[in-house]
A protein has these predicted regions:
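N-terminal metal-binding scaffold of metallo-dependent hydrolase/deaminase domains
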Residues: 1-44
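Alpha-helical scaffold segments that flank or form the walls of functional sites
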Residues: 75-140, 160-169
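A structural motif
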Residues: 119, 141, 201, 260-261, ...
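Metal-coordinating catalytic core of metallo-dependent amide/deamination hydrolases
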Residues: 131-246
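Active-site-adjacent C-terminal substructures of enzyme catalytic domains
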Residues: 235-289
Length: 289
């Protein structure tokens, strides 16, 4: 088993006071066993590797809370389009051409990019979690998978299988309940997901209030915003999370606070698709995570 010493580092632990101090970090196998100042007694052990971090800042890895990792192959493929046209006219047709094994390879490309940016784990949603799981385990990268149940791919049975399988496998991977979005998922499937959430007593995650069009069409279908509709069917009874959260009113924000629905903002994506900007001051004022 490896035993690594990182020394002569400026260390930022991300505690509330944000103190930076000179010290070292020991990694015993896959666990951080020591963070602190130089301790001669601890350094008597034989390390398998010692790394001089002089001139560098050592801090916890970043977490990317919303990714579609295998979509690396679509970067710059379609620009200057609104979300629906971008998805339906360009992205979905290209994804339909993916062959067996492609997602594993493309996920590895994404993981390499994450690591060069200091990202050590991600929360990923895509069409084949098993291929990405294989890639993450092979590369020693931590991934939490989010289900993407919708009218076109996946099923409630598959969601149940992924929940049972990926949460009992390698410790680097795990799975959370999720649907792609309200606008891609029938009421029947959404209600089925709410039942799963109640069965497992688990939160549910999805793309939420990303565009003005999404909110307007949901109001036409159900007479409510996406947040209000999903809450009405019990989807958020055990909490959850919404990716984007751009087009939310005060009622939506109050529901998210009360039901412990976190909002993951995606400013670069929203800028690319001109979807809008999440109202961070309002979210913070409402007490939303």
């Amino acid at each position: 088993m490896s035993f690594i010493r990182l020394y002569h580092a400026k260390i930022l632990t991300m505690e509330e006071d944000a103190e930076v101090f000179d010290g070292e970090v020991h990694i015993d196998g896959n666990r951080i066993s020591y963070v602190g100042e130089n301790n001669p007694e601890l350094n008597k052990r034989k390390f398998t590797r010692e790394i001089d971090c002089e001139g560098n800042l050592l801090m916890p890895g970043f977490k990317n809370a919303h990714t579609h990792s295998a979509m690396t192959f679509l970067r710059s493929y379609a620009d200057d389009l609104p979300l629906q046209n971008w998805l339906n006219d360009r992205v979905f047709p290209m994804e339909a051409k993916l062959q067996k094994g492609d997602i594993e390879i493309l996920s590895k490309v994404a993981v390499l990019e994450y690591l060069t940016s200091g990202i050590t784990s991600n929360f990923d949603m895509y069409v084949d979690n098993y291929q990405h799981a294989k890639a993450s385990v092979q590369m020693g990268f931590r991934t939490v998978f989010c289900g993407e149940l919708n009218n076109f791919t996946g099923s409630l049975a598959r969601t149940r299988e992924e929940y049972e399988t990926l949460n009992k496998g390698d410790e680097l991977v795990s799975f959370r309940l999720g649907v792609h979005a309200e606008y891609t998922t029938s009421r029947e499937l959404l209600e089925g997901m709410a039942e799963l959430a109640h069965e497992y007593k688990q939160p549910v995650y999805l793309h939420l209030a990303e565009t003005k069009k999404e909110v307007e069409e949901c109001k036409m279908r159900y007479g409510m915003s996406p947040v209000q509709f999903l809450d009405s069917i019990g989807l958020f009874d055990y909490g959850g999370g919404g990716f984007h959260g751009v087009w939310m009113d005060e009622t939506d924000r109050n529901i998210c606070r009360e039901k412990k629905v976190s909002i993951v903002t995606n400013p670069s994506s929203n800028a690319k698709l001109a979807s809008g900007i999440a109202d961070l001051p309002a979210l913070k004022k409402a007490g939303i995570n």
